[in-house]
Amino acid sequence: GFSLGGFVAQEIALKAPELVRKLILTGTGPAGGQGIDKVWSVSWLLMLKGLITFRDPKFYLFFTQSANGQKAAHAFLKRLKERKKERDKGPTPSAFLRQLKAITAWGRQMPQDLSLIKTPTLIANGDSDIMVPTVNSSGCARRIPDWKLIIDEDAGHGGIFQYHADFVTKALAFLDS
């Protein structure tokens, strides 16, 4: 699961482990994780910056502001437009608000006992995630017994999109192992 989807994936792995053969958590963190409850203020400021600069907010939310990060943001947004038919619609404003509310609530929860997750787990993130701070990926890894951690350099919340080819190769190898 990516981001909020990673929260859901952790819940499933804890509550119905028989349904999960392998777990991949990206750009996510544990309940009560450091800084997760700050997503509201981080997101709004960067969404406003996107409006002011006439740029997609993903430039600021998912990628670093280095030349490498911005090049990756351009490439990612271009890839998103490649699919011409049956494209998913973006979230409505009310759905986006509900997502932020759910992420904030997750960040304020009591931590769960992730040592109960016995499923082999691949955890990936960028080294500069400002939405779900990177320290939370390391925190998950320390608490889940069977884990592999990938932290991409000069990458943010969208690290798996920035280094997509490398991530897919590693994810497939993990799933095949």
Model-derived segments and spans:
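Hydrolases whose catalytic domains are alpha/beta-hydrolase-1, hotdog thioesterase
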Residues: V8-I12
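Short beta-strand/loop motif that positions the catalytic acidic residue
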Residues: I117, I123-N125, D129
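Conserved alpha/beta-hydrolase "acid-adjacent" motif
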Residues: I130-N136
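Conserved alpha/beta-hydrolase "nucleophile elbow" surrounding the catalytic nucleophile
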Residues: G1-G6, G126
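Catalytic active-site module of serine/aspartate enzymes centered on a nucleophile-bearing elbow/loop
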Residues: D146-S177
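Flexible "cap/lid" loop of the alpha/beta hydrolase fold
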Residues: L14-K15, R21-I52
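Conserved alpha/beta-hydrolase catalytic His-Asp/Glu region
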Residues: D56-R108, Q112-D113
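Core-facing hydrophobic residues within beta-strands of well-ordered domains
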Residues: V20-R21, W147
